[in-house]
Amino acid sequence: ENESFEQSEEKDENQYSVNIPMRYYYKGKFRKGWVSISNCFRGTWVVGTPGSGKTFSIIEPFIRQHSAKGFAMVVYDYKFPTLATKLYYHYKKNQKLGKVPKGCKFNIINFVDVEYSKRVNPIQAKYINNLAAASETAETLLESLQKGKKEGGGGGGSDQFFQTSAVNFLAACIYFFVNYEREPYDANGKKLYAEKRQDPQTKFWKPTGVVRDREGGSIVEPAYWLGKYSDMPHILSFLNESYQTIFEVLETDNEVAPLLGPFQTAFKNKAMEQLEGMIGTLRVYTSRLATKESYWIFHK
């Protein structure tokens, strides 16, 4: 007869815990107990064969209990709309009971059935305020697009060189578009009017720093600034331009220019194979996002 060990029969509950009821066999009979995950911030690894009940026994209790405790959740529903439907039910239920924090909303991002999806634009100055943030965004994006690639497999140093080059180049493009002709907006997403004055020497129009609710209107404080073309569709389209066009455009930003050194050197020396290795890697992976659905979702 299979025997197990004595397990916890007390419910260890706190404001962050997830408590899952269970049954176990001990000393000849089935007993009731609790699986108490008292510190979910340490991470929970769920392992089981397909159809073993991972979602029903672990994931769904997490959704139910964390929703009731006012947690913000990001749920990857690989069998949409199974989990999304249950999550929405608990969201509405707890909202009615006053357990959902004020301002908390329910949104879906769906790259297949876009009629269910909200639009989202992660390429904004409020998220990317310096080159370090742009590099982090670029690295995260490329790692996500390479999720099928085996870690540690490959050509070692040369692969790492091309990977780092791809990250740097994408970071340069992201930071350029984040800051190019930034425009002010209010908290409701309404575009405001930024006053400009013509420089008598260069004849270029430069912002004065004064923002109004409309031309000639009242002076206001913008909620955020957004680059004129600051979104993924414009960046992805820009990556498919000729190398000469790309370099000429990016060179106009003094902060971005230093990142372009290795690429410009390869281009001027006509080392096209090296250039394709550096930028071609980026183009191949980002091409996965070049769909009508992705463009609609990521458009500002």
Spans of model-derived segments:
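P-loop NTPase motor domains
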Residues: 23-31, 35-300
